[in-house]
Amino acid sequence: MLEKIFHLKENHTDVKTELMAGITTFMTMAYILAVNPSILSASGMDANAVLIATSLASFVGTALMALLANYPFALAPGMGLNAYFSYTVVLTMGYSWQLALMAVFVEGIIFIVLSLTSVREAIFNAIPMTLKSAVSVGIGLFVAFVGLQNAKLIVNSDSTLVTYQHFKGETVHRIGVGAILALVGVLITAVLLVKKVKGGILYGILITWVLGILCELTGIYIPNADAGMYSVIPTSFISFDFSALGKTFGQVFKTDFSGVGILNFFAVMFSFLFVDLFDTLGTLIGVASKADMLDEDGKLPHIKGALMADSIATCAGAVLGTSTTTTFVESASGVTEGGRTGLTSMTTGVLFLLAVVFSPLFLTIPSFATAPALIIVGFYMMGSALKIEFDDPAEGIPAFLTILAMPTAYSISEGIAIGVISWTLLNLITGKAKEKKISPLMYILTVLFILKYVLL
């Protein structure tokens, strides 16, 4: 049955590999179950309701990805978009969280239309292969940087923006132990991968978590909520209280539009739409490139199904009570473990569904245990750099700017925007437009990106 649905042999994989890959993807994404409620509750939403909505929206989106596209990509409410939802739309602009959900819902409807009319697919195919390879590398650096941050290996600095963690004095017990455990986790995971241990990334997460538990039991690791270092020992395993979901479910349809200008509403909606569109395209490009899923023309077969899954999940998430649901770059961790079909994503989706019940257990997975997986995934995605034509400055410079922008701007969509603008203008100004056969859609995207920077 699984073979018939997911075509495992055709994709050179098996059930065990797909299950391990799906579990790995979930483990690297599980942090969203804790982070999303924390961020959205700042807007006045009930945290428990958001937790359940996050789990269900992730299940819906990821299961649809498995069934509609047969790809190993997982979806969940996107980081960055949730912060924009709470801190900008609600707290700064003064709109209700119900109206913010309506903006997300409308964005999802527009995406469904764009996916049905192949507009999103056309944008994907219009991006030149050099930039697609650069996006994959840029996402790798971005994911690794997120891992370093999650592990507290990189911290804020007033003088240099960021700096490495210091391992001396009281800092060791307050924050440093988690950072040290993350470094140990990177080494453990690397050894497992060098030894070609199947499921090495997943085992690396679990071993690092166990080491954290031992450190907490012996007093070496001291939980400190103010520093973002929580207990790694589960105090309970299950919860059957689902009543909180009623506080957010369907609230999107009770939006009060009085006093809200139509232009202001569409400005908010467009911001969600822009970031979601290019974050999703960037993730699909990057992870698909890593998995060798792109054909010789740089196109992704069955992309329409993947984009429909993403679009429907956004609408479903808004109805359930969460911000924009999007494809996660952490999907690359499952791909690195060998995941190649929808069985990987279905496994991840089922785990998100189970998280509704087992949330107390999943919420104790520490960030220092999943950080090594993200760092190692970053390494694996560097391979796409070999496909970039660095000997041609017209190709290499835009690719470099794309790679540079993603971790430094902390945004996949910004990296794509800078790459598209620089590639189009550089080839146009130097008279290479005819030679490179620049798509009309690339000109349109370039103009839209420039207008975005000028007007927004």
Language model segments and positions:
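Loop-to-helix transition at the N-terminal end of transmembrane alpha-helices
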Residues: G44-A63
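Juxtamembrane transmembrane-helix boundary signature
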Residues: S58-M79, I110
